[in-house]
Amino acid sequence: MEGLRRHSVMLDCKLWKDDPIYFFKTLPPYISKYAQRADDASIQAQIDVFGKDDVGAMPGALGPRGNFAAVTFAESFPDRVAMLAYLNEVLSFYECFEKQMTEMLDATLYANPVPKDPKYDNPVWQANYKNTMTKWPKILENLDPKLGPKCVKSLVALVEGTDMEPKMAHYKTMKEYALDRTNYIAWPVACDNAEFGSQLNLTQDQLDSVRDIFLPLWTHSCYVYDYYHYDKEAEIHSTYGKGRSMINSIPLLNRLKGLSVEEAKAWLKQRCFELEKEYLQRKEDYFSENPVEAVPVDLRRWFLSQEDLATGFAIWCATTYHNHPPFGEGYAAPYEKRRKEGALWFEKVTESDQLMTGGFEVRYAN
């Protein structure tokens, strides 16, 4: 697998090695060489939806150890990692604008709406969000006529997916829950984003041939997500979700195993380390039967993409402003720093299309 990385470097060891918040012991996280573009794109998405004076109104993909796209799609091409950063920043607002997202995707929402803070019932923000939802599918298709539409299709499938909430009282095992949760946290969308970002040429048969190898990583990501999103989800649920079952491993572990919140978190963390071992064993078994030189290059790169998805997601979930203090205020420092460096963003959602086609290399003041 040596020599396959072109667009990423290992994240500084000080940011993850031996850190108890990072739930891997062997696999390191990587970050895009173009991480600044990803951050700039995320800020543009914030401006497009909330306006230049409310950047961070809903914290999305930024974090102190890496932008979501920069660490999960680390091997993406420079223009594509920026586009994915914009896309995922916008999609991270789904809990605020679920109705608008569904409408603009021409999808049908079968699940109950996600509980949200009423402050997001802002008609200007809602109109801006609808504008963002008209532009990025076109940009994806222009960048890649094959993989761009695939990303959009998987997002529609996610929106139209079965609601997990009624099932929470009936799951008998964590494995059963994790299979559904993988889809619910948009992992098929993330996989298609990764394939798009790295511009991989893979057949469906090739993807299917290695799918089971990555199942431990997918479950790992479900558990990391539940571990680090629980506190925020519990707060939102207690305020706006009364009468609904909370979709998270922690209340399920309480029902299935009688674990307290802290005991359930300890269980999830330990299980993540076990899942890493399971994945590494499956990977070793695969390459013992399939010599590396006999495996197509893009299929080998798919292994890197899957590992980046899981490791990047793990470090991001543990640190992102989406879940952790200072929350939306975390956008202020990088936004102000870039402004002092002379970076300029488009101030209206109807103008920022020009920025997208340039790979999110922001303009600078003279």
From Swiss-Prot:
Catalysed reaction equations from the record: N,N-dimethyl-cadaverine + 2,6,9-trimethyl-13-oxatetracyclo[6.3.1.1(6,9).0(1,5)]tridecane carbocation = pre-flavunoidine + H(+)
GO molecular function: lyase activity
EC number: 4.2.3.-
Metabolic or biological pathway, per its Swiss-Prot or TrEMBL entry: Secondary metabolite biosynthesis; terpenoid biosynthesis
Biological processes annotated in GO: terpenoid biosynthetic process
Cysteine pairs bridged by disulfides in the record: none
Domain of life: Eukaryota
Entry keywords, A to Z: Lyase
SUPFAM superfamilies according to UniProt: Terpenoid synthases
Quaternary structure annotation from Swiss-Prot or TrEMBL: Homodimer.
Reported function: Terpene cyclase-like protein; part of the gene cluster that mediates the biosynthesis of flavunoidine, an alkaloidal terpenoid with a tetracyclic cage-like core connected to dimethylcadaverine via a C-N bond and acylated with 5,5-dimethyl-L-pipecolate. The tetracyclic core is synthesized by the terpene cyclase flvE and the cytochrome P450 monooxygenase flvD.
Record family assignment: Belongs to the terpene synthase family.
Protein name as it appears in the record: Terpene cyclase-like protein flvF
Organism for this UniProt entry: Aspergillus flavus (strain ATCC 200026 / FGSC A1120 / IAM 13836 / NRRL 3357 / JCM 12722 / SRRC 167)
